[in-house]
């Protein structure tokens, strides 16, 4: 669109005001486009469409007084890296993301790492959030994922952990840290489970 405005500027070059006006409009459109790109880079994960880690860090001080933090991690992610390569992993992550969205949870979802999604359950205790995490885990475990090269469907599982904000927690990162420790402890022994911290 900016190029079209620039072309109009050259077309009406006989008038001294028209080129300046069209070039200024083109510059404004380019700046707005760059602003949108910067915003999307900071706040959105392009692969999944979820909010990014940066968005979590920026938005965490605005969370309500009562909330629960859940972490979902793809089981055997290192083996998936080797088996499917980069493109296959991206496709699997997109399919898992769609399955999580289809589970119709009320959580705000952030992509926090390669294989990690953080879910914020606003105004919910960890028992109510646990039920939603279990619903998500079951939805992914029951799904069959088809990759273009694969002739057989791929079965994937996720593990999760949930923790509620305590009064002693200074910020959401402390709750997230406690949740991650519980997930690591659980994942050391078993896959396809949801635990409470």
Predicted features and spans:
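Catalytic-core segments of nucleotide cyclases and related cyclic-nucleotide turnover enzymes
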Residues: 130, 134, 163-196
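Conserved long alpha-helical elements within nucleotide-processing catalytic cores of c-di-GMP signaling
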Residues: 43, 53-68, 78-101, 110-114, ...
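Catalytic core regions of nucleotide second-messenger enzymes
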Residues: 110-111, 140-159
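Conserved beta-strand cores of small sensory beta-sandwich domains that regulate signal transduction
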Residues: 68-72, 110, 161-163
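Signal-transducing coiled-coil linker helices
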Residues: 1-3, 7-46, 54-65
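Conserved metal-coordinating catalytic motifs of nucleotidyl cyclase and c-di-GMP turnover enzymes
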Residues: 48, 70-73, 114
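Catalytic strand-loop-helix junctions within cyclic-nucleotide turnover domains
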Residues: 120-129, 150-152, 158-175
């Amino acid at each position: 669109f900016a190029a079209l405005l620039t072309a109009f500027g050259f077309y009406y070059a006989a008038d001294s005001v028209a080129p300046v006006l069209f070039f200024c409009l083109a510059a404004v459109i380019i700046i707005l486009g760059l602003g949108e790109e910067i915003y999307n880079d900071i706040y959105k994960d392009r692969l999944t469409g979820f909010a990014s880690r940066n968005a979590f860090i920026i938005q965490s001080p605005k969370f309500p007084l009562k909330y629960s933090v859940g972490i979902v991690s793809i089981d055997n992610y290192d083996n998936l890296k080797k088996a499917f390569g980069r493109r296959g992993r991206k496709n699997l992550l997109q399919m898992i993301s769609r399955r999580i969205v289809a589970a119709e949870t009320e959580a705000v979802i952030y992509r926090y790492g390669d294989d990690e999604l953080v879910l914020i359950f606003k105004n919910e205790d960890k028992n109510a959030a646990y039920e939603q995490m279990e619903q998500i885990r079951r939805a992914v475990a029951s799904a069959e994922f088809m990759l273009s090269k694969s002739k057989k469907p791929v079965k994937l599982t996720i593990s999760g952990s949930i923790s509620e904000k305590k009064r002693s927690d200074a910020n959401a990162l402390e709750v997230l840290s406690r949740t991650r420790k519980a997930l690591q402890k659980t994942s050391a022994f078993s896959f396809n489970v949801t635990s409470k911290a």
